[in-house]
Regions:
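Transmembrane alpha-helical segments of polytopic membrane transport and secretion proteins
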Residues: 1-26, 247-269
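Glycine-rich helix-loop "coupling/hinge" segments at transmembrane-helix boundaries
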Residues: 124-125, 154, 201-238, 257-267
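Transmembrane alpha-helices
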Residues: 136, 140, 173-205, 229-233, ...
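C-terminal transmembrane helix and the adjacent membrane-cytosol boundary/short C-terminal tail
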Residues: 98, 155, 186, 190, ...
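Generic hydrophobic transmembrane alpha-helix motif, especially the helices
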Residues: 109-145, 152-153
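Periplasmic/extracellular loop-to-transmembrane helix junction in inner-membrane transport proteins
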Residues: 6-11, 38-84
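Transmembrane-helix boundary motif in ABC transporter permease subunits
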Residues: 78-108
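Short cytoplasmic-facing helical segments at TM-TM junctions of multi-pass membrane proteins
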Residues: 106, 153-191
């Protein structure tokens, strides 16, 4: 009896965890529908949900949505690969080498405090308004969280573990592979997760620079023709893609940190 009750309670808890994240979005959707139907929200300011669904379906059937999503996704992932790769490499360098930290960290921290929007005029002068400018902005945005969390992760590895490994003859690459990297990995993946979200934020900024394709182009073009429903579709697309990126990051954490107590079965991710 106790076992049955425990199993039922666990199943109910899992069901609640699956439902709970959707309660706030559903409440907002209901409030949105009520607001537009009662006239509290003007359809010129925010169209009713049904109009947004119709606009989305029209974009899907015409193929326009998928074409623009593919372009934006390619830009985002390529920018993430470049910026994240450089951030990881420099984070490892400054974390492992005091000389590299002295030479690079101060400069990187100064650049980090420059707002991305302030860089746009300079980026246009450097790269023009083609794809290079967009990729640079995305790469710049994702670079810093990956760099900072990699650097912090390396520096926060327990020194006693390193000394213990050395006492057993573990040195060089083996020390890095079996002690330093596993110890730093949780922090590195936090940076990756944050960077995956920031990737889409930077892409929104980047695609306002005279884009000829992509979700940003679709949204800006709709704004010119006062197609508010299409603008909302574009915003929701960014939100969905950002959520998918976060789900991917969580999955990556569970797979690569399956040995960590916080990510084992039954632990809160």
């Amino acid at each position: 009896m106790t076992t049955t009750t425990s199993t039922t309670g666990a199943a109910a808890a899992r069901a609640w965890r699956g439902i709970a994240p959707w309660l706030v979005p559903l409440a907002l959707l209901v409030a949105w529908e009520i607001g537009t139907r009662t006239g509290w929200l003007s359809t010129r300011v925010l169209p009713e949900p049904v109009a947004v669904v119709r606009a989305a379906w029209s974009l899907v059937t015409s193929g326009e949505m998928w074409a623009n999503v593919k372009v934006s996704t390619w830009r985002a992932l390529l920018g993430f690969a470049v910026g994240g790769g450089v951030g990881l490499a420099l984070g490892l360098a400054t974390g492992l080498s005091k000389a590299a930290e002295v030479a690079l960290d101060s400069t990187i921290q100064m650049i980090r405090n420059i707002p991305a929007l302030a860089m746009i005029p300079l980026v246009i002068l450097w790269f023009g308004i083609d794809e290079k400018a967009k990729l640079f902005l995305v790469a710049l945005g994702v670079f810093f969280p990956v760099y900072i969390n990699t650097y912090h992760g390396i520096r926060s590895v327990d020194a006693s573990l390193i000394e213990m490994a050395k006492s057993y003859g573990v040195r060089g690459f083996a020390l890095y592979r079996h002690v330093i990297l596993p110890g730093a990995l949780p922090s590195i993946l936090v940076g990756v997760r944050f960077a995956l979200g920031l990737m889409w934020v930077m892409l929104i900024v980047a695609e306002t620079i005279s884009a000829q394709s992509g979700i940003g182009y679709m949204t800006m073009n709709a704004r010119e023709f006062l197609q508010t429903d299409v603008v909302v579709v574009g915003i929701l697309l960014y939100a969905v893609l950002g959520k998918l990126a976060d789900v991917l990051a969580k999955w990556l954490e569970r797979v690569t940190l399956c040995w960590h107590p916080a990510y084992q079965s039954g632990a809160k991710a």
